[in-house]
């Protein structure tokens, strides 16, 4: 999960425009899962099955609310992420100001295009560089699809991952960030468990994501 939490920093595109637009409730789902020192073999197998299922279903989307703060600056908005294999289409909107930004790209090629900025769209062979030049944030968008589903990233380098009793990631510490998976959407006949509420912090930078709805293609 190398650096993935910074992906949500794309909301820094419009902290002023998003300020106060959408609330992201804290802890509305009850107590967060506890970190455990040992995980049962059945839990490990269940988590391995969850990840295998998600890897086999690369077309998915989620809608939710995101809030980001950096020191005294902060804002919130609605986030609509659509993924089809390596291709993604991400829309961030501020309902009150009616502002919106769209990021599209391909995790295979790394290219991306950002729309909704003053001065017109920006595009380039490196989506991360496009976002860096537009916002000042380093955002590894190619890792976001794995991270938001709490999938392990095999080639991401060393990371500390604490698990809950179900074998799922509970807290991840890497590259200065502490990422907490605080609530999960229960499994259904159509999909396995998926993260619902995630909070992260790195110094005075904080990000909160609340997923209202997951949709996965058969």
Swiss-Prot record:
GO cellular component: cell outer membrane
Signal sequence coordinates: 1-20
GO-annotated biological processes: lipoprotein localization to outer membrane; protein transport
Pfam family, one: LolB
InterPro entries per UniProt: LolA/LolB/LppX, OM_lipoprot_LolB
Lipid group attachment sites (S-diacylglycerol cysteine): 21
Record's bilayer topology term: Lipid-anchor
Major localization class: membrane
Keywords, comma-separated and alphabetical: Cell outer membrane, Chaperone, Lipoprotein, Membrane, Palmitate, Protein transport, Signal, Transport
UniProt subcellular location: Cell outer membrane
Lipidation (N-palmitoyl cysteine): 21
Domain of life: Bacteria
Subunit structure: Monomer.
Job of this protein: Plays a critical role in the incorporation of lipoproteins in the outer membrane after they are released by the LolA protein.
Family: Belongs to the LolB family.
Listed name of the protein: Outer-membrane lipoprotein LolB
UniProt gene name: lolB
